Amino acid sequence: MKCLGLISIAFCIVLSASVTVFTQKKTIILVRHAEKADSTSADPELSPEGKQRAERLVKVLGKYEPGAFYSTDFKRTRDTARPFADKRKKTIETYDARKPNELIEAIMKSKTKRFLITGHSNTIPGLANALGKKDLFKNLDDSEYGVIWIVRIKNGQVDRIEILPF
């Protein structure tokens, strides 16, 4: 009988943890990296204009106060997120852009409510599509910067996606 009681308690704890994950509201901010300095390098740094844009991101998105930062493993994506992460005293976690579902799963399981994710012209729109489970967004032109997707999750589903310039 005592064992049955412990099993019941354990089941309730697991069940309540699962419910919490799916009832949380989350805000996922998706940003393509800022302008890069040298398009001939495989891993270019940000240009002076890109560095200014990365600094502006802090002001534009300050009210969202991300609790977690994710970036692909490239200088330009990390350096786009860095001013904001530094201001919030957070580290930037690396994710594999070829595996968007792994990132989405980690976000959905996390207790964190607000995320900033930096990626590329051909990965950020795909991540927005994967989150919304719809093919709404096409890859950005290589010269297109300054677009922010704000994805709001409610009860485990996309509630809305806002697109903002910056």
Regions inferred by a protein language model and the residue ranges of each:
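Compact alpha-helical subdomains of small soluble proteins
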Residues: R114-F115
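Bacterial Sec-dependent N-terminal signal peptides
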Residues: M1-K25
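Short beta-strand segments
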Residues: T118-G119
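Active-site-proximal alpha-helix that buttresses catalytic centers in soluble enzyme cores
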Residues: Q24-K111, I124-L127, K134-I148, I153-F166
